[in-house]
Amino acid sequence: MPPELLLPVPEELDPAEVVSLILNYLTAHCILHKKGQLKNGETVLIHAAAGGVGTALLQLGGLLELKMYGTASVTKHPTVREYGGIPIDYKNQDFLEYIRNEVPDGVDAAFDPIGGLNLRRSYKAVKKGGRVISYGFAGDSFGGMKQMAIGVLQMAALNFWPDGKRVTLCATPGEVKKDNAWYRETLTELISMLAARQINPVIGARVPLMEVKRAHQMLEQGNVAGKVVLVCEP
């Protein structure tokens, strides 16, 4: 581990919760502040709102008093509501139609980890001059670097439309590498917020390291709210 990535953590904090900060909450913070530059009271659409990054976005977005719409399966709607979001059943409701009915001019920003057709529809849900932050391409049929390349090309194409909207990629590992000062400052802030219980990472499951296959299956099935954490047994 490079020493510039190491930070002190109070002993009393739950290691599983601290682990959630390193990717999920850093990503959410990057989306809201560094890339999205969200202001208090704005309206946003959060896809996969009951997932690890989604619940982090809900909690950090709540501190900004954002009005938050979040897509999730019905069984996870209580989680979305608990953290201040308005749930949308993406399996039985057209999220774009729902947003257009609720916010005719469009939301200020949309956060999309899915890509493909979903990213294009997220773009349509955003008002003129709004922004779409992409942070993954989970819905694309291709894998690896090809998946990433296609997603980036799609974002570039959307940015050519003359409606003032912008589509931006948030790739947290890349942000950490190129801006270590941001990483250290932001993670230190998040650790302090956790210690003060201003944020409460949602741990959907704690799985022994030897059962890593089961953890991946849980993620693929999408039936866990929050983060799946691998635990090293004594």
Cite the ranges covered by each PLM segment.
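NAD(P)H dinucleotide-binding glycine-rich loop of Rossmann-like/cofactor-binding domains
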Residues: M1-A48
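Glycine-rich helix-loop-beta junction characteristic of Rossmann-like nucleotide cofactor-binding loops
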Residues: K34-L38, N101-P104, K124
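Local beta-strand N-terminus motif with an aromatic residue
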Residues: G41, G84, D105-D108, I199, ...
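N-terminal Rossmann-like NAD(P) cofactor-binding module of classical short-chain dehydrogenase/reductase
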Residues: L45, D108-F111, I133
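N-terminal Rossmann NAD(P)H-binding glycine-rich loop of SDR-like oxidoreductase domains
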Residues: A50, G54, L58
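Adenosine-nucleotide cofactor-binding segment
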Residues: G62-R121
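Glycine-rich phosphate-binding loop and adjacent beta-alpha segment
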Residues: L117-A196, V231-P234
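C-terminal capping/lid region of NAD(P)-dependent oxidoreductase domains
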Residues: I191-R206, K213-P234
